[in-house]
C-alpha cells in the first residue's frame, strides 16, 4: 500500500490531478439526480425576481436582526476563547488535534439538532452550535499563528523564566493583533451560520426568511435578505477590537431566556443515559452475548441502508459541485482583475462576488428547491455559486499581485498563456482545500430533502431515534475528516501545501491573501 502511494505521488502533477477530478466529476454527473421537477420553474423564478426588486422594508423584524448579531457574537466569541485554550496544547497532544478535527467536521446544523434535544430552542443551543465547530477551527488556526510567530523576544528574557510567563509577556502581545483580526473576520462567517440556524427554528433572520419563502412573500424576504447583506457589508464598521466587549455584553442582554436549569439537567440525563444509547443495549444484560449480537446487526443495518447510500450521494453531490466551482471561479476571477476588467467593471465584479459569497449556500439551495423542485440540482447550483465566488475572489486578488512584463499580451492571450499558468498551482490549492468544506455542506443539504447523509440524520431525529442519528453524524464526521486528510496529502504531493488557502484579514482589517496559517473558511 505504501509503495503504491509513493508511486502515485511520483506520477501526480497538475495535469493528471485535474484530469482525475474532471473524470470523477463526469461520473458523478452521470450518477446524480439533476432533474428539474417543478411544474412551472420559470414562473416561480420570475416571482422571486419581482420580489427582489420590490423589497417590503416594513416587514423587517428588528428583533430578528439583533438576535442574529447576538448569536454570532457570542458563538464566535466562545469558540475563539475555547480555541485559544486548545491552541496552547494543540501541537503536543494527538488527542487534542483529533478532538478539534472532529468538532470542525460536524456542521453547525447537526450540532444544533443534537443540542435541541437537551436545551430546546433556547439561545444556548444556537451559541453552542456555532461555538463547538468554531472552537476546532480557531484551535488549528491560532496554533499555526503561534508556531509561525517571531521568537526574537524570547531571547531577551531572563534565564529560568517559566513557560507561561514567557508566553504571556513575550509572545502573546505580538499575537493579539493577528488573533483579533482573524476572530473579527470569523464573525462574518458566524453571521452566515446564524442565519442558517434560523431555518430549523432559532429566532434569527433565517426563521423569518423561512416563513416568508414558504408563504411566497418574496418582497418581505428580499427586505430581510438585504438587511443581512447590510450587516455583512458594514461588519468592519461595527465589529472592531474596541467594540468587542460592548458587543459581548449587549448580546448577552438581547438574547431571550432559555429553559430552566432543572429542565436542562433532566434532559441531559435522559439524553446521555437513554437517547444516545444504542437501542439493543438499553436495559440489556451487558455481560451476555445476545445484546452485542443485536448491536452488530443494528449497526450493520444502519451501515448498509443509511450510511453507505447517504455517503455515496454526499460524495456525488460534492464532486459535481467541486468541478462546477472550479470552472466558475476560472470564469469569475478576471472580473476583479486590473488587467482584465475595465475601470468601472472591477467595482461591479467585486460587489457581485462579495454578495454571492456572503449568501449562505443552504439558504440559496432552500430557495432554489422551491423553484426548481426536489433534486440535487438546487444544491449543486448553491454550492457552485457560493464557493465559486469565494475562490474567484481569492484568485482575482492573487492575479492582481502578479508582476507582468511591459510587453505582456492582453485579453485572452494574457489569461491563457501567462496569468492562468502562473496561478494554476494556487488555483489547485484553493480547490483542494474547499473540497472538504463542500462535502460538509453537501451532507447538511439532506435536511432539505436531498438524499445525502443529512437526509438520514434529519429522519432519525424526527423519529426520535437519536442513537441512530449519532451514528450517522459520526459517519459524516469520519467522511469529512477522510476527505480533508486526502486533500492535505494531495496538496503535499503537488508541493502546494504552503500556499494560502483561505480568506483572512490583514492588519488594516481588509481581506488579504498573503501566506498565512492555513485555516478554515
Q: Would you name each region that the model predicts?
A:
Residues 103-134, 353-384:
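Generic hydrophobic transmembrane alpha-helix motif, especially the helices
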Residues 123-186, 190-193, 374-438, 485-488:
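Membrane-cytosol interface at the C-terminal ends of specific transmembrane alpha-helices
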Amino acid at each position: 500500500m505504501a509503495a503504491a502511494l509513493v508511486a502515485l505521488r511520483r506520477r501526480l502533477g497538475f495535469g493528471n490531478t485535474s484530469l482525475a477530478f474532471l473524470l470523477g466529476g463526469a461520473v458523478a454527473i452521470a450518477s446524480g439526480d439533476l432533474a428539474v421537477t417543478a411544474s412551472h420553474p420559470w414562473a416561480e423564478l420570475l416571482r422571486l425576481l419581482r420580489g427582489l426588486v420590490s423589497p417590503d422594508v416594513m416587514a423587517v423584524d428588528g428583533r430578528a436582526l439583533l438576535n442574529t448579531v447576538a448569536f454570532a457574537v457570542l458563538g464566535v466569541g466562545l469558540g475563539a476563547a475555547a480555541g485559544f485554550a486548545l491552541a496552547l496544547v494543540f501541537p503536543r497532544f494527538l488527542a487534542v488535534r483529533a478532538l478539534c478535527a472532529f468538532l470542525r467536521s460536524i456542521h453547525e446544523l447537526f450540532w444544533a439538532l443534537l443540542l435541541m434535544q437537551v436545551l430546546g430552542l433556547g439561545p444556548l443551543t444556537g451559541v453552542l452550535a456555532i461555538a463547538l465547530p468554531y472552537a476546532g477551527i480557531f484551535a488549528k488556526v491560532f496554533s499555526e499563528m503561534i508556531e509561525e510567530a517571531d521568537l526574537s523576544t524570547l531571547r531577551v528574557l531572563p534565564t529560568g523564566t517559566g513557560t507561561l510567563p514567557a508566553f504571556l509577556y513575550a509572545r502573546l502581545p505580538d499575537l493579539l493583533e493577528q488573533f483579533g483580526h482573524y476572530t473579527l473576520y470569523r464573525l462574518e462567517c458566524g453571521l452566515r451560520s446564524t442565519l442558517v440556524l434560523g431555518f430549523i427554528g432559532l429566532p434569527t433572520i433565517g426563521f423569518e426568511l423561512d416563513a416568508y419563502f414558504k408563504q411566497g412573500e418574496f418582497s418581505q424576504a428580499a427586505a430581510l435578505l438585504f438587511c443581512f447583506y447590510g450587516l455583512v457589508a458594514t461588519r468592519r464598521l461595527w465589529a472592531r477590537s474596541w467594540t468587542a466587549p460592548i458587543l459581548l455584553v449587549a448580546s448577552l442582554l438581547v438574547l431571550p431566556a432559555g429553559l430552566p436549569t432543572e429542565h436542562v439537567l433532566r434532559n441531559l440525563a435522559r439524553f446521555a443515559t437513554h437517547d444516545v444509547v444504542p437501542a439493543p443495549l438499553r436495559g440489556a444484560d451487558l455481560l451476555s452475548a445476545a445484546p452485542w449480537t443485536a448491536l452488530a446487526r443494528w449497526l450493520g443495518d444502519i451501515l448498509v441502508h443509511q450510511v453507505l447510500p447517504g455517503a455515496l450521494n454526499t460524495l456525488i453531490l460534492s464532486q459535481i459541485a467541486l468541478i462546477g466551482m472550479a470552472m466558475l471561479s476560472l470564469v469569475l476571477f478576471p472580473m476583479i482583475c486590473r488587467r482584465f476588467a475595465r475601470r468601472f467593471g472591477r467595482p461591479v465584479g467585486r460587489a457581485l462576488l462579495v454578495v454571492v459569497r456572503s449568501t449562505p449556500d443552504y439558504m440559496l439551495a432552500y430557495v432554489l428547491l422551491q423553484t426548481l423542485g426536489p433534486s440535487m440540482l438546487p444544491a449543486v447550483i448553491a454550492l457552485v455559486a457560493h464557493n465559486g465566488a469565494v475562490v474567484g475572489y481569492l484568485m482575482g486578488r492573487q492575479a492582481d499581485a502578479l508582476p507582468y512584463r511591459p510587453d505582456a499580451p492582453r485579453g485572452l492571450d494574457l489569461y491563457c498563456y501567462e496569468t492562468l499558468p502562473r496561478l494554476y498551482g494556487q488555483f489547485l490549492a484553493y480547490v483542494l482545500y474547499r473540497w472538504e468544506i463542500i462535502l460538509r455542506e453537501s451532507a447538511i443539504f439532506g435536511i432539505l430533502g436531498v438524499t445525502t447523509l443529512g437526509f438520514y440524520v434529519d429522519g432519525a431525529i424526527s423519529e426520535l431515534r437519536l442513537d441512530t442519528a449519532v451514528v450517522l453524524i459520526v459517519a459524516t464526521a469520519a467522511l469529512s475528516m477522510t476527505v480533508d486528510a486526502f486533500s492535505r496529502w494531495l496538496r503535499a504531493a503537488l508541493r502546494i501545501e504552503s500556499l494560502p488557502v483561505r480568506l483572512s484579514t490583514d492588519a488594516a482589517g481588509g481581506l488579504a491573501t498573503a501566506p498565512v496559517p492555513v485555516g478554515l473558511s
